[in-house]
């Protein structure tokens, strides 16, 4: 059964900053491999890390805090995060590719808060490690299967991965779960996958999933979708495989009625856009 997410369809103007060519983002990029820059937040959520803690997070993973130039290089190939984070030398900012009224003050580029005199301020972190293990990426292919790190083996502790799917204007994304096995807890607070009907993990929250019950299919309202995978420091499990295919505007599969079985899924926390 398919959960149709009813929102206003996202209509974007073509922007060179996304790397668009003829209306499509023309290259699929593993952000960690292409630029070495990735976003990290505290286990307890956004904006919880002091400068010293942010440095420690990056160094624990074999990297270091990204410089302004490294973050800008990542931004130029599509790295977009609507969350301010520490950089090297005590600088704070975040990369914006597509301007929006709710993020980046309608601007593109690095939204720069400058070098902070108070290193006890709490933000996220932008780390740099060109040898980081693949975990997340940007997909623009019409269809693809992607997996949790190490699948079919168990994923590691302390993972935070982001996948961004971006298709042609007017197309939608049909997401299907092929395998799903994460640590279970009633609130999905330990290990989980979150899905967002947007190009970041701030807007369009669909839901949070954990346990071993296969989630329902999901169809986006627009041509973008974001998935976030997080694991804690204790129990691991088998991981997941997720498939997406492109839904063209005239496709019948995108015209069905919205029917939801959220109430029957004990391993699901609903977002405001998951059902009517």
UniProtKB/Swiss-Prot annotation:
GO terms for cellular component: extracellular region; extracellular space. GO terms for biological process: cell adhesion; fibronectin fibril organization; hyaluronan metabolic process; negative regulation of BMP signaling pathway; negative regulation of inflammatory response; negative regulation of neutrophil chemotaxis; negative regulation of osteoblast differentiation; negative regulation of osteoclast differentiation. Coiled coil: none annotated. Transmembrane segments: none annotated. Major regulator of extracellular matrix organization during tissue remodeling. Catalyzes the transfer of a heavy chain (HC) from inter-alpha-inhibitor (I-alpha-I) complex to hyaluronan. Cleaves the ester bond between the C-terminus of the HC and GalNAc residue of the chondroitin sulfate chain in I-alpha-I complex followed by transesterification of the HC to hyaluronan. In the process, potentiates the antiprotease function of I-alpha-I complex through release of free bikunin. It is found in: Secreted. Residues 135-247 form the CUB domain. The keyword Glycoprotein applies. Its EC number is 3.1.1.-. SUPFAM superfamilies: C-type lectin-like (SSF56436), Spermadhesin, CUB domain (SSF49854). The Link domain interacts with various extracellular matrix components, including heparin, heparan sulfates, hyaluronan and I-alpha-I complex. It is required for binding to various chemokines. The keyword Transmembrane does not apply. Residues 36-129 form the Link domain. Induction: By serum and growth factors. PROSITE patterns: CUB, LINK_1, LINK_2. It comes from the Eukaryota. It holds the Pfam family Xlink. Residues 1-17 form the signal peptide. InterPro entries: C-type_lectin-like/link_sf, CTDL_fold, CUB_dom, Link_dom, Sperma_CUB_dom_sf, Spermadhesin-Link_domain. GO terms for molecular function: calcium ion binding; carboxylesterase activity; fibronectin binding; hyaluronic acid binding. This is Tumor necrosis factor-inducible gene 6 protein. It comes from Oryctolagus cuniculus (Rabbit). Vascular smooth muscle cells. Interacts (via Link domain) with inter-alpha-inhibitor (I-alpha-I) component bikunin. Interacts with ITIH2/HC2; this interaction is required for transesterification of the HC to hyaluronan. Interacts (via Link and CUB domains) with ITIH1. Chondroitin sulfate may be required for the stability of the complex. Interacts (via Link domain) with various C-X-C and C-C chemokines including PF4, CXCL8, CXCL11, CXCL12, CCL2, CCL7, CCL19, CCL21, and CCL27; this interaction interferes with chemokine binding to glycosaminoglycans. Keywords: Calcium, Cell adhesion, Disulfide bond, Glycoprotein, Hydrolase, Metal-binding, Secreted, Signal. Ca(2+) binds at residues 183, 191, 232, 234-235.
């Amino acid at each position: 059964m398919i959960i149709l997410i009813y929102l206003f369809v996202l209509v974007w103007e073509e922007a060179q900053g996304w790397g668009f060519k003829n209306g499509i983002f023309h290259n699929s990029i593993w952000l960690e491999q292409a630029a070495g820059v990735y976003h990290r937040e505290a286990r307890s959520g956004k904006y919880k890390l002091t400068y010293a803690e942010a440095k420690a997070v990056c160094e624990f993973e074999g990297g270091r805090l990204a410089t302004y130039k490294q973050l800008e290089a990542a931004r130029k190939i599509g790295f977009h995060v609507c969350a301010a984070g520490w950089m090297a030398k005590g600088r704070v900012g975040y990369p914006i590719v597509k301007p929006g009224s709710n993020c980046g003050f309608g601007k593109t580029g690095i939204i720069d808060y400058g070098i902070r005199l108070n290193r006890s301020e709490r933000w996220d972190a932008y780390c740099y490690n060109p040898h980081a293990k693949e975990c997340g990426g940007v997909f623009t292919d019409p269809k693809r299967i992607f997996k949790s790190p190490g699948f079919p083996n168990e994923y590691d502790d302390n993972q935070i991965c982001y996948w961004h799917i971006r298709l042609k204007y007017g197309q939608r994304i049909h997401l299907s779960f092929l395998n799903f096995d994460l640590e279970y807890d009633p609130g999905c607070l330990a290990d989980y996958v979150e899905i967002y009907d947007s190009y970041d993990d701030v807007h369009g929250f669909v839901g949070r999933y954990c346990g071993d019950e296969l989630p329902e299919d999901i169809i986006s309202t627009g041509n973008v979708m974001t998935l976030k995978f997080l694991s804690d420091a204790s129990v691991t499990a088998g991981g997941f495989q997720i498939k997406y295919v492109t839904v063209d505007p005239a496709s019948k599969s995108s015209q069905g009625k919205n029917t939801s079985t959220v109430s029957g899924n004990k391993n699901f926390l609903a977002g405001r856009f998951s059902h009517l």
